[in-house]
């Protein structure tokens, strides 16, 4: 995925991170972003798909709202930990080990999808595959929400213009909002799937 040598890029790399104490520090922020709450309030989805779900806290939030939630991550360690986190939960999301650029094991279409920190790790070729998969897995007119770092680990400078261009054939960039999540310059992107 990424070209920076010190950045985790493969599922094995992320498995090591998720098995370390660093994972707790890096992904321990359990607050649900306002943007995700708004996604639910505005769209009133029955189904949701999270790409790069990690430990599954956002998919768990969706399930708690009564949404049939599915979370995907290529780290088997993250998915194992996500499943353990919800073992006693009343409403459980489905967690799947999978590559966000090739999700052939999923055949349903979702009312919404979202990605909080995955897209910015992909190279240009992977981004194109990602867009194709999100298009295939979302219902026409559905919203895909992305949070991405502006100076991404993949060395690609992300911006509203760049995101609009990458998604142009399948989605309309409906809204962007600058963010300082985790003290990092970033943006939220609301993309609407073509009919």
Q: Which residues does each PLM region occupy?
A:
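A short acidic, Gly/Pro-enriched loop at the edge of an enzyme's catalytic core
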Residues: 105-113
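A short SAM/SAH-binding and catalytic strip from SAM-dependent methyltransferases
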Residues: 112-125
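Class I (Rossmann-like) S-adenosyl-L-methionine-dependent methyltransferase catalytic domain
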Residues: 1-51, 55-105, 122-133, 137, ...
């Amino acid at each position: 995925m990424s070209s920076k040598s010190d950045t985790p890029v493969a599922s094995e790399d992320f498995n090591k991170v998720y098995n370390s104490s660093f994972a707790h520090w890096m992904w321990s922020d359990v607050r649900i972003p306002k943007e995700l709450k708004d996604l639910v309030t505005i769209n009133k989805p029955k189904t949701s798909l999270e790409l790069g779900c990690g430990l599954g806290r956002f998919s768990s939030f969706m399930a708690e709202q009564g949404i049939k939630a599915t979370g995907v991550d290529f780290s088997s360690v993250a998915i194992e930990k996500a499943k353990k986190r919800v073992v006693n939960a009343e409403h459980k999301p489905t967690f799947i080990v999978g590559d966000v650029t090739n999700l052939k094991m999923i055949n349903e279409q979702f009312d919404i999808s979202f990605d909080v920190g995955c897209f910015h790790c992909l190279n240009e070729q992977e981004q194109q595959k990602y867009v194709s998969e999100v298009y295939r897995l979302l219902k026409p007119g559905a919203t895909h929400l992305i949070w991405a770092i502006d100076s991404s680990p993949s060395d690609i400078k992300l911006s509203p213009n760049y995101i609009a261009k990458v998604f142009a054939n399948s989605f309309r960039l409906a809204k962007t909002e600058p963010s300082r999540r985790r003290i990092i310059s970033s943006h939220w992107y609301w993309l609407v799937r073509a009919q």
